[in-house]
Amino acid sequence: MPKKFQSENTKSAAARARKAEAKAVADAKRKKETEDAFWQDDDKHVVRKEHRKEEKEKKRLELLERKKESQRLLDEEDSKMKGKPTKPAAPSKVTRAQIEETLCKEEKHKDAPEKPKTHLEIPLEENVNRRVLEEGEVEARTVEDAIAALSIGKELDRHPERRMKAAFTAFEEINMPLLKQENPNMRLSQLKQLLKKEWMKSPENPMNQKYATYNSH
């Protein structure tokens, strides 16, 4: 009998040992699963936290960039107000329509009749302006004086076109105001044509004087 009792105790101890071992294995497995779940949740939390951090940094950089752009535009506007642009402005392009409009305005202004001068604006005595010659200056008060002064010297005889121009200028200064008074409605171009016709047959024209001298001989 004692031997049989001892055998039963040994079997019970072995069964308890196996049961305890199985429990230990099960506990270890549950613990590992719990730890894995914890770390998995923690990883998700870390990822979300890192993502929020990245989004926050991105927004901060965007805000900083907008501030820099606003400051740049403000500085540029201040510079323009002071008359100092930050960079040279590109030359503006002129369209064909603008060119034609400008030419049309100039043509209308040119053809507009000139306002006749009053008796207060016309000088009582015409003075011929000083004519600059090659070797000095002369002053003439009449057309004859201007022609005589410009005709002196062999050097001047080599340039008849200068004497012609001076004589015509003196003729124009005297006769143009008279033509404007007589023809107040004429345009300037018409007055110049009329003056030219008068000049071609005027005795004050050096060419007419030359022919008159030739015919007198």
Curated annotation (Swiss-Prot):
Q: Does the keyword Cytoplasm apply?
A: yes
The GO annotation for biological process reads:
transcription by RNA polymerase II
Q: Which domain of life is it from?
A: Eukaryota
**InterPro entries given for it?**
Ccdc124/Oxs1 (IPR010422), Ccdc124/Oxs1_C (IPR054414)
Which cystines does this chain contain?
none
Transferase: present as a keyword of the record?
Answer: no
The protein's predominant localisation is cytoplasm
Q: Which residues form a coiled coil?
A: 41-83
Any one GO cellular component localisation term in the record? nucleus
* Location(s), subcellular: Cytoplasm, Cytoskeleton, Microtubule organizing center, Centrosome; Midbody
Stretches with biased composition (Basic and acidic residues): 18-45, 52-74, 98-123
Q: Where is this region: Disordered?
A: 1-123
Q: Which UniProt keywords apply?
A: Coiled coil, Cytoplasm, Cytoskeleton
Query: How the protein assembles, per its UniProt entry?
Result: Associates with translationally inactive ribosomes in the nonrotated state.
Q: What does this protein do?
A: Ribosome-binding protein involved in ribosome hibernation: associates with translationally inactive ribosomes and stabilizes the nonrotated conformation of the 80S ribosome, thereby promoting ribosome preservation and storage.
Q: Report the sequence similarity comment from the record.
A: Belongs to the CCDC124 family.
The identity of this protein, by name, is: Coiled-coil domain-containing protein 124-B
Source organism (scientific name): Xenopus laevis (African clawed frog)
Q: Give the gene that encodes this protein.
A: ccdc124-b
